[in-house]
């Protein structure tokens, strides 16, 4: 009996067994990677308050977003107008894109100094001002979306 022949047979069987483990790992590779995270806020602007609310967004919200971009907290932001299908749907969307889900951890603590710098209001004053904007708009809700980047 040739001992080399026996070794090559064992090596072949070992290689075959290892290939069974490699195939599931290959098959399990994701076809995408996690991309940026976008927060979409649906807003219903009160009739007659559109210009007032847009002025607020231009004066305060935009400034806060620009500073957040400079700090690296925000990748981009947009304001979208919409044509609602019924009177209870949003007619404005505030869209903010963050680099990743982890960036949302501690976001309030990150944004407070920026908000204070831009608006010259402390947290309590900013919270009160947000409540007063209720005469201009109703916040209908938020949706968090993660972009899935196809490989």
Model-derived features: positions:
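Hydrophobic pocket/interface hotspot
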Residues: 41, 53, 94, 104
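Short, solvent-exposed mixed-charge patches
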Residues: 150-151
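Short beta-strand/turn micro-motifs at beta-sheet edges
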Residues: 27-31, 80-83
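N-terminal signal peptide c-region/cleavage motif recognized by signal peptidases
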Residues: 22-24
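An amphipathic, aromatic/His-enriched active-site/gating alpha helix that lines ligand/cofactor pockets
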Residues: 29-32, 63, 67-75, 95-145
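Bacterial N-terminal signal peptides that target proteins for export
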Residues: 2-14
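Acidic/histidine-rich, surface-exposed loop or edge segments in extracytoplasmic proteins
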Residues: 33-48, 92
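N-terminal, post-signal-peptide region of Sec/Tat-exported proteins
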Residues: 46-93
């Amino acid at each position: 009996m040739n001992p080399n022949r026996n070794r090559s047979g064992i090596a072949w069987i070992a290689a075959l067994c290892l290939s069974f483990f490699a195939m599931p790992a290959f098959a399990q590779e994701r076809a995408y990677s996690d991309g940026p995270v976008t927060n979409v806020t649906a807003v219903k602007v009160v009739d007659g308050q559109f210009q007032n609310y847009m002025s607020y967004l231009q004066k305060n919200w935009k400034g806060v977003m620009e500073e957040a971009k400079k700090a690296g907290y925000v990748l981009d932001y947009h304001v979208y107008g919409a044509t609602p299908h019924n009177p209870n749907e949003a007619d404005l969307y505030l869209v903010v894109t963050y680099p990743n889900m982890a960036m949302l951890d501690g976001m309030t603590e990150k944004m407070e100094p920026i908000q204070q710098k831009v608006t010259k209001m402390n947290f309590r004053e900013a919270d009160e001002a947000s409540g007063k904007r209720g005469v201009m708009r109703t916040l209908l809700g938020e949706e968090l979306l993660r972009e899935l980047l196809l490989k």
